[in-house]
Structure formats: structure tokens, C-alpha cells
UniProtKB/Swiss-Prot annotation:
It comes from Kluyveromyces lactis (strain ATCC 8585 / CBS 2359 / DSM 70799 / NBRC 1267 / NRRL Y-1140 / WM37) (Yeast). Binds 2 manganese ions per subunit. Pfam families: Arginase (PF00491). Mn(2+) 2 binds at residues 188, 190, 290, 292. This is Guanidinobutyrase.
Amino acid sequence: MKVAGFILGALIQFSLTEGHVEQNENANLTEMWGEDWPFSGIQTFAHLPHHKCLIDMEKKFDIGVIGVPFDTAVSFRGGARFGPQAIRKASQRQTSMRGFNFRADINPYQDWASVVDCGDVPVTPMDNCLALKMMTAAYENLLSHESQTSDNNLPPRFVTLGGDHSIILPALRALRKTYGRLAVIHFDSHLDTWAPSKYPSFWHSDTSEFTHGSMLWIAHNEGLLTENNNIHAGLRTRLSGSSFEDYDDDDKVGFHRIEADEIMDGGIKSIVEKIKSKIPSDVPVYISVDIDVLDPSAAPGTGTMEVGGWMTRELIRIIRELEDLNLVGADIVEVSPPFDPTEITSLAGAQIAYELITNMVKKGPIDPELIKHNLELSDKLTQGQQLLGFSSPTDELNDKIQKEQFVLQA
């Protein structure tokens, strides 16, 4: 009796399967084989289409994910060169089929924007001076693409997977030429506005000035940042010496500071309000996320951990509240897989990258008139600096520009 039941069940199963195959004989190949499981397929970010964006200049898209596997500008633990691979691997449960962001009410992979994975910049680990040139040239190349939304005359936007934090400098250099001076929201446990002379070494060279802790100081001195619309958020690092001298130096670079502990007093809402109060609605914004902004319990796989950080849940909520900003570029950096045995750091990195892409998509295409206006203001400020012999913008410079009638006209 049991044998007869087994045979009957097998026949029914065969009949059902045969019927399904017959009903789908006319299915095309994409319908049959176009969807991957999280564990199948080539590991692009979120199973996005892969395009060699540095080579194929004819390809049009709106948002690109680009890896920059560079980590030879670190001051402590390395390993972030393997970050892009790890973040892509951790993103494999993201797909366009199952990509709806319940926090934002959109699926960024099925909306107006064409989102692709551009692969990696093959940056040298042998020579930091050459690496900086390579990364800058790569970003300039990427920004010479046309976006699929061709009516706005602006290039695609990019989310970068690092790599150590120094990779923000070549990105800002390239973006400055396209968008003008940028307001930077810098999620990090460290200031990263240290002058190279702050590092404890008698030995210095031009190459040694370029580090993952000095790049925002360099960016300021090169006129890449807005004067007073930049934010550090999540700070909790120890400072130099026996005073707030590092904060005094940071003031001169044009940053406002939000310390990690502030979230305990005013909650997430107060953090968001403080960020938004410093970022005008008419400037292009770059968001940089150093994974060490998170507490080591949530992100142990990084080079310079600091205890007492935010949780992933809190950072995601803060990013979600910034979706109305004019986000023209972003990065997630300092993910170091050798120190991430359970992969929770790379998983956090993949989620943060997803949230940043969501922000770009939900905001929609950037208004080209806004960018034109910002470029004009930025160029006039730079010209004023050069005429007056200033190497970087300060309040003193702005006062003097007005007195000399180098007034920035709208």
C-alpha cells in the first residue's frame, strides 16, 4: 500500500512539472535564466549590470558603483584594498527584484535611474603619488560619460566603494570641475582635517602629505569645499596635545562638528536637524561614510576603530533623513575584510551604499541651473582668492572680497 502511494505521488508530481514546462515553452531566454539567486551569478554590487565604464565611453547610465581598491595611505591597519570585493559579496541579497526600500518607499533599482556596476579602478599599490594621479584621472574619465537622463546635461553620479579614506580627494578634485565647490557631510570617528605636520615624524615628503587623515585639509586648501557648509558627524577620536587645538584647526578648514555622544542627548532628530541647518538647499553635496563611524561592535573590520560609536540602525536613519539634499557623489570607505571574520562590517557597508543610491534616486535628476549657479559662484571665489593672494578661503577673505568689490553675484 505504501509503495502504491509513493508511485501515485510521483506520477502526480511528474504531471504537474510536465504541465508547467508545456505552459512555458514560449518563454524567452531572459525569462528562463535572467534572474539570479543571492548565491549565483558574477558578484557585481546588488547583481547590477556590469560595464567597464573606464573603457566603454559610449555607455549611458545615471548612477554608477565604482570600486577603488587602494589602502596604502593608511596610518594604522591596512586591508581596505579588499573592501570593494567584500562589499559586493555582502550585497548579494540585494537584487532589482527584491530591492524595495521600505524606509524610502521606492525600489532604487527599478525606478527612473539606470544603475550599473562600473567595476574597479586598477590603482597601483606601489606608488602613492602615481596612485593619486590614476584615481583623479579615473574620476575625470567617469564624469565625462553622459547620463541616460540626457536632458539635464550632467554626468552620471557615483557611489564609491573604498579603499581607505584618502580616495575622497581625487573624487572631490574631479567633482569640483563639474559641480563647483561641494558641501561635504563626513561621517567618521576622526576629523581627517589634520595638517601633514601633525603626524609624529621628522621625515616628510610630498607623497607623505597624502594620507587618509589629511585629505580634507588638502581639499580645503585646493578650494574644493564650500567655506562653511561642511559637517563631521560621529566624532569621538582623541585629540592632539592637551587642548582643543585640533578643533581650532578644524574650524579654519570650514567644518562644523557633531560628536557621537550628542545622539544620547537629543537623539537622531537633533543630529539630522544640526546637519540640515548647515547645508543650504542650493549647493551640491558629497556624503562620505567612513565605516569606523559605527561602533566596533557593529563594524569591527576597519583600520582605526574607536569605541562608543553609532549603531548601523542609527546611521541608516540619519542618511534616510537626508534624502532631499542635492547628492552628487558619495563613498563608503575603510572596510577592511581581514579584520571582519563574520562579515558584519562589509554587510553594513553594502546597506549604507544601498541607502546612498536610494537617496540619489529618490531626489531625482539634479537641476542643471543649480549647478551652473554654483559653478559661477565657486569660480568667482577662486578668482578672488588668487587676486588677493590667499591660498584658501576664510572669513577674512570673504570680508576683504566684499571691501574690494569682488562681490559674488547670483
